[in-house]
Curated annotation (Swiss-Prot):
Pathway: Nucleotide-sugar biosynthesis; UDP-alpha-D-glucuronate biosynthesis; UDP-alpha-D-glucuronate from UDP-alpha-D-glucose: step 1/1; Cell surface structure biogenesis; S-layer biogenesis. SUPFAM superfamilies: 6-phosphogluconate dehydrogenase C-terminal domain-like, NAD(P)-binding Rossmann-fold domains, UDP-glucose/GDP-mannose dehydrogenase C-terminal domain. The active site is at 269. Keywords: NAD, Oxidoreductase. Disruption phenotype: Mutants exhibit defective or limited motility. Activity improves as salinity decreases. The keyword Endoplasmic reticulum does not apply. Its EC number is 1.1.1.22. InterPro entries: 6-PGluconate_DH-like_C_sf, NAD(P)-bd_dom_sf, UDP-Glc/GDP-Man, UDP-Glc/GDP-Man_DH_C, UDP-Glc/GDP-Man_DH_C_sf, UDP-Glc/GDP-Man_DH_dimer, UDP-Glc/GDP-Man_DH_N, UDPGDh_AglM. Belongs to the UDP-glucose/GDP-mannose dehydrogenase family. This is UDP-glucose 6-dehydrogenase AglM. GO terms for biological process: polysaccharide biosynthetic process; S-layer organization; UDP-glucuronate biosynthetic process. Pfam families: UDPG_MGDP_dh (PF00984), UDPG_MGDP_dh_C (PF03720), UDPG_MGDP_dh_N (PF03721).
């Protein structure tokens, strides 16, 4: 089929390349001329394992990019994959979505055939039906069900494994209002269903599909926070939390996924999505106490880590290496990274900070241009008084003699990845 994707960030670029891999002809529409040029040159604008190969393979063939909305006219369906950042009260900012919906509607006004518009961005329930659909209707002169269909297809992509997550999904959620919309969605995803071995396809309503995404992320975020809360309790009793969590993960009712206790969750999804659904629930008069508790536990983990360091010395004037700047391994994304909170607190306390990450250094440099950055973990550790491990990159598990170059050889491990060794003042966060 002929597909168009509005937005070429982490989600937009990934789904565009993956749809091309499935045999669809895809045009990526974006207002950023540099990103458009990069995609057309076969260069992925983001770091994501496997994505660069797909973009290079299909650019100029089944995958192209443009700033011109008119190219949407030759496509059968448009996916909206635009950012929905958090506002000060936690609710989502729909500015980019509204602008794109209006521009899309103005374009579709010149199309005679029916067109399907699919919300891919994470939005709270009723957004597609009450905000996006009416905006497209107003600008296009069309009506939903008469020349225009709307749908919701939430993404469940994890940064660092997004390509694999798309091509090997646990489930595919299709939210729509009309039979024609369901039929078009089914045709779009038919190659994926066949390739992935017939994963469950959930056919549901639009608002239900929107809520499924939030419920999914809220559950996972809460599971991590519960693991951290249990691990914090283990620590005060001198109990090995890793053994406890590994054991309960063997229970089929619980499972081992997302039981890795440590510094907590960050990134572009969990913080934003938990804040958004909490704000949306409060706007409807409901206080989501359990979900708020999960956020509170998560927010407290970096401070607990800093307390372990403060127990050893006054931070003022000390050189502290922060190992890992990305919010998780496998990505260069620093959004809501735990390292940001650690670095800011260290600077506020008068510490001298050196950061290291195998891929995210340049992104963090934009946030903290005045701290030092090392080209390797070994360089970061040299002459440091302490090290804080913030991201569980595999290379940190292999560190050994590199610690000998530290002055005081204090290591506080937020991810339980460093191997204990003689001569280290080592403590894990949990």
């Amino acid at each position: 089929m002929e597909l168009s994707i509005i937005g070429s960030g982490y989600v937009g670029t990934t789904i565009a390349a993956c749809f091309a891999e499935l045999g669809h002809d895809v045009v990526n529409v974006d207002i950023d001329e540099d990103i458009v040029a990069s995609l057309n040159d076969g260069q992925a604008p983001i770091h994501e394992p496997g994505l660069a190969e797909l973009v290079e393979r299909y650019a100029g063939d089944r995958l192209r990019a443009t700033t011109d909305y008119d190219e949407i006219l030759d496509t059968d369906a448009t996916f909206l994959a635009l950012p929905t950042p958090s506002t000060d009260d936690g609710s989502i900012d729909l500015g980019a979505m509204k602008t794109a919906a209006t521009s899309l509607g103005e374009t579709l006004a010149r199309k005679d055939d029916s067109h399907l518009v699919v919300t891919k961005s994470t939005v709270v329930p009723r957004t597609t039906v009450d905000v996006i659909g009416p905006r497209i209707e107003e600008a296009s002169g069309k009506r939903v069900g008469d020349g225009l269909d709307i749908a919701m297809n939430p993404e469940f992509l994890r940064e660092g494994t997004a390509v694999d997550d798309f091509l090997s999904p646990d489930k595919i959620v299709l939210g729509a209002q009309t039979d024609r919309a369901y039929e078009t969605l089914a045709e779009i995803f038919a190659p994926l269903v066949e390739r992935a071995g017939n994963p469950p396809v959930v056919k549901t309503g639009i608002s239900e599909a929107e809520m499924i995404k939030y419920a999914n992320n809220a559950f996972l975020a809460s599971k991590i926070s519960l693991a951290n809360d249990l691990a914090n309790i283990c620590k005060v009793f001198g109990v090995d939390s890793a053994e406890v969590l590994e054991s309960i993960g063997l229970d089929s009712r619980i499972g081992s996924a997302f039981l890795g206790a440590g510094l907590g969750w960050g990134g572009s999804c969990f913080p934003k999505d938990t804040a958004a659904i909490i704000a949306a629930a409060r706007a409807q008069g409901y206080e989501p106490r359990l979900l708020q508790a999960a956020v509170d536990v998560n927010d407290g983990q970096p401070e607990r880590m800093l307390d372990l360091l403060r127990e050893r010395f006054d931070l003022d004037g000390k050189r502290v290496a922060v190992l890992g700047l990305a919010f998780k391994p496998g990505t260069d994304d620093i959004r809501k990274s735990r390292a940001i909170l650690l670095i800011q607190a260290l600077l506020d306390a008068g510490a001298d900070v050196v950061g290291y990450d195998p891929v995210a250094t340049e992104n963090m440099r934009e946030r903290f241009p005045d701290i030092d950055y090392a080209d390797s973990a070994a360089d970061a550790l040299a002459n440091a008084d302490a090290a804080l491990v913030a991201t569980d990159w595999d290379e940190f598990a292999a560190l050994d003699d590199e610690f000998d170059a530290m002055r005081e050889r204090i290591v506080i491990d937020g991810r339980r990845i460093v191997t204990r060794r003689e001569g280290l003042d080592y403590e894990s966060l949990v």
